């Protein structure tokens, strides 16, 4: 009886908890070092050294910042709604972390391998704006509230375009399962053109290149990265919805923001860059574990996130709205129609 209970209920539960904790630790380490890389790239563009004191070459700077945030005293404004004020950063961080449950970092390596993973990510990422709105409203200050309103408008504007991009990927791959989407990219445009072996030309970035560009730019807007950081807009709103936050609550907002950025880099990798597939189907590249290729591609996409931050000036609010509704929405909708018609009349899939 006890053995059956252990094997039927307790053992599978322990496996899920173990997978979740392992993913959480790896994800937090990846966020810490991508934040370090972001600061280093930003410093290099400005001809500075960046973090270089804590640990060798400054590699422990993110952990020093973590300790600094944790030991600080959290300050709650007198007029704030205390319950909502403290709940908002937990909502933001929890929703950002929960999306990673369905991300496959290698063949069969996912906490929950569900066949509607793409729909799950779209649904959860749409809810992340609530943490920002709660924080802005509960602060009882006009500057956080303005940042929260900008966030709501920005999320609505670019969520639609991202949705149409995902529709084109679903049409090409024929599945909402992220693992299947990656596997379909092993035989794509390059194979159709008669290349002798599978390569990066088979991935969706080539056949869906306009949607690849739209998704990348929309991901910047979705995660409030420059040049679309109108939620924070440091030169205008001081710190946007986080202006009244300090200590651990501020760190949780910051964590949620960077986890969402890494998620968008991972989604770009899965949808358009072949996930864990090597760039060439040759034995000496197939020998490298798939998770290594996945992490390298995520870091590559994040590098371009950082470069855009360094070189592109911030858009005005009206330019942001115009780009979302008058450019990206018609283009993405047209690409959905073109892709569907192409698949219907050619039978290519």
Curated annotation (Swiss-Prot):
Keywords: Cell inner membrane, Cell membrane, Membrane, NAD, Quinone, Translocase, Transmembrane, Transmembrane helix, Ubiquinone. Its main location: membrane. The keyword Flavoprotein does not apply. The chain crosses the membrane at residues 11-31, 83-103, 116-136, 162-182, 200-220, 252-272, 288-308, 323-343. GO terms for molecular function: NADH dehydrogenase activity; oxidoreductase activity, acting on NAD(P)H, quinone or similar compound as acceptor; quinone binding. Its EC number is 7.1.1.-. Pfam families: NADHdh. It comes from the Bacteria. It catalyses: a quinone + NADH + 5 H(+)(in) = a quinol + NAD(+) + 4 H(+)(out). PANTHER family: NADH DEHYDROGENASE SUBUNIT 1 (PTHR11432), NADH-UBIQUINONE OXIDOREDUCTASE CHAIN 1 (PTHR11432:SF3). NCBIfam families: PRK06076.1-2, PRK06076.1-6. NDH-1 is composed of 14 different subunits. Subunits NuoA, H, J, K, L, M, N constitute the membrane sector of the complex. NDH-1 shuttles electrons from NADH, via FMN and iron-sulfur (Fe-S) centers, to quinones in the respiratory chain. The immediate electron acceptor for the enzyme in this species is believed to be ubiquinone. Couples the redox reaction to proton translocation (for every two electrons transferred, four hydrogen ions are translocated across the cytoplasmic membrane), and thus conserves the redox energy in a proton gradient. This subunit may bind ubiquinone. Belongs to the complex I subunit 1 family. This is NADH-quinone oxidoreductase subunit H.
């Amino acid at each position: 009886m006890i053995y059956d209970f252990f094997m039927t209920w307790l053992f599978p539960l322990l496996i899920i908890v173990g997978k979740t904790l392992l993913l959480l630790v790896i994800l937090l380490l990846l966020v810490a070092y991508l934040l370090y890389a972001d600061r280093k790239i930003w410093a290099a563009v400005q001809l500075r050294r960046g973090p270089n004191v804590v640990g060798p070459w400054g590699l422990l700077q993110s952990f020093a910042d973590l300790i600094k945030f944790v030991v600080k005293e959290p300050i709650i404004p007198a007029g704030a709604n205390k319950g909502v004020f403290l709940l908002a950063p937990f909502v933001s961080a929890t929703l950002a972390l929960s999306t990673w449950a369905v991300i496959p970092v290698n063949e069969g390596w996912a906490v929950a391998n569900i066949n509607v993973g793409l729909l799950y990510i779209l649904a959860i990422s749409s809810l992340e704006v609530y943490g920002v709105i709660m924080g802005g409203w509960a602060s009882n200050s006009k500057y956080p509230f303005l940042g929260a309103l900008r966030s709501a408008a920005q999320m609505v504007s670019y969520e639609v375009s991202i949705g149409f991009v995902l529709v084109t990927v679903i049409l090409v791959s024929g599945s909402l399962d992220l693992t299947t989407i990656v596997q379909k990219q092993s035989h794509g445009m390059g194979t159709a053109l008669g290349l002798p072996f599978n390569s990066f030309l088979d991935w969706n970035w080539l056949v869906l290149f306009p949607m690849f560009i739209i998704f990348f730019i929309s991901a910047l807007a979705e995660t409030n990265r420059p040049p679309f950081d109108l939620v924070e807009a440091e030169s205008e709103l001081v710190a946007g919805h986080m202006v009244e936050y300090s200590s651990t609550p501020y760190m949780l907002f910051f964590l949620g923001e960077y986890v969402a950025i890494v998620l968008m880099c991972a989604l770009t990798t899965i949808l358009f860059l072949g996930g864990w597939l090597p760039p060439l189907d040759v034995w000496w590249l197939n020998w490298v574990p798939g998770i290594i290729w996945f992490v390298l591609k995520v870091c590559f996409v994040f590098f371009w996130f950082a470069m855009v931050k360094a070189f592109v000036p911030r858009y005005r609010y009206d330019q942001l709205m115009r780009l979302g509704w008058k450019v990206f929405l018609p283009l993405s909708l047209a690409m959905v129609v073109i892709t569907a018609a192409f698949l219907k009349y050619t039978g290519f899939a």
